[in-house]
Amino acid sequence: RYEPRARWIEQEGPEYWERETRRAKGNEQSFRVDLRTALRYYNQSAGGSHTLQWMAGCDVESDGRLLRGYWQFAYDGCDYIALNEDLKTWTAADMAAQITRRKWEQAGAAERDRAYLEGECVEWLRRYLKNGNATLLRTDPPKAHVTHHRRPEGDVTLRCWALGFYPADITLTWQLNGEELTQEMELVETRPAGDGTFQKWASVVVPLGKEQKYTCHVEHEGLPEPLTLRWGKEEPPSSTKTNTVIIAVPVVLGAVVILGAVMAFVMKRRRNTGGKGGDYALAPVSQSSDMSLPDCKV
């Protein structure tokens, strides 16, 4: 059964949770069909573990107009098929996805998906923003610090942490004498912290004794001005020493909805009220993917 995970959505009535529960059960049945179809396309046995991911969502202008829509599928962590920015055509990642693309083109799937993105997706975003305005449109500035790690090679890794920020959009860069170290820098994707905020770090390898020449620069809309940090020039928060744990929360089935650069959150939506999943099956009439995940072999 669907249950609230944020206080602001608890105000939705019983009919909302009943409807979403029915839709989730319909999704489950549809995805079972999709997985069996994918197994057949890739000539795989029914044994073992396989994953089908779906993400749909809309970016909306401040005046409520649709800016960009997403409708994407991935199989076993790899791109499968995605609705393009024109919301009319598809990009298929491999030969199996080409089969799905042809079936969807024949069935007019892109037109139906575009109608959902331009209509229901935008309408629900407006409702969620109205109900959760104080939470969803807030800005939490990052807590930033630099950690120091000796390497067996004799040099040092400096890691710049940004923790507890919202929304997710943030910029971390390392500089040496005012020049950005884009090529030398390791940068992880922004990750959910599990408490409604986000985390990110960027690291650079530097010669021992030269640490003070390197500066980390942090830009976020929650900051009155960008931060500039050096190793040893600030105290890390007591709860986030060198052994800071980054938590990654995978989103398997949801729709990412963003208002400008201000707000991003995940909502689970489907156009249908459940059913057999015909509009979403990979076989006769299905939809899309574009997770841009590495090391995918098909």
From Swiss-Prot:
It is a single-pass type I membrane protein. Residues 277-298 are annotated as: Disordered. Residues 1-244 are extracellular. Disulfide bonds join 58-121, 160-216. GO terms for cellular component: external side of plasma membrane; lumenal side of endoplasmic reticulum membrane; MHC class I protein complex; phagocytic vesicle membrane; plasma membrane. It comes from the Eukaryota. InterPro entries: Ig-like_dom, Ig-like_dom_sf, Ig-like_fold, Ig/MHC_CS, Ig_C1-set, MHC_class-I_related, MHC_I-like_Ag-recog, MHC_I-like_Ag-recog_sf. Residues 266-298 are cytoplasmic. Keywords: Disulfide bond, Glycoprotein, Immunity, Membrane, MHC I, Phosphoprotein, Transmembrane, Transmembrane helix. GO terms for biological process: antigen processing and presentation of endogenous peptide antigen via MHC class I via ER pathway, TAP-dependent; negative regulation of neuron projection development; positive regulation of T cell mediated cytotoxicity; T cell mediated cytotoxicity. Glycans are attached at residues 43, 133. Residues 142-230 form the Ig-like C1-type domain. The chain crosses the membrane at residues 245-265. Its main location: membrane. The keyword Transmembrane applies. Coiled coil: none annotated. The modification Phosphoserine is found at residues 289, 292. It is found in: Membrane. The antigen encoded by the PAG64 clone, normally expressed only on lymphocyte subsets and thymocytes, is found in increased concentrations in all transformed cells tested, in an embryonic carcinoma cell line, and in pluripotent embryonic cells. Activation of the gene appears to be a general feature of carcinogenesis in the mouse. The PAG64 clone, and related cDNA clones, have in common a repetitive sequence in their 3' transcription units that has characteristics of a transposable element. Involved in the presentation of foreign antigens to the immune system. Heterodimer of an alpha chain and a beta chain (beta-2-microglobulin). Belongs to the MHC class I family. PANTHER family: HLA CLASS I HISTOCOMPATIBILITY ANTIGEN, C ALPHA CHAIN (PTHR16675:SF251), MHC CLASS I-RELATED (PTHR16675). This is H-2 class I histocompatibility antigen, alpha chain. It comes from Mus musculus (Mouse). The lineage of its organism: Eukaryota, Metazoa, Chordata, Craniata, Vertebrata.
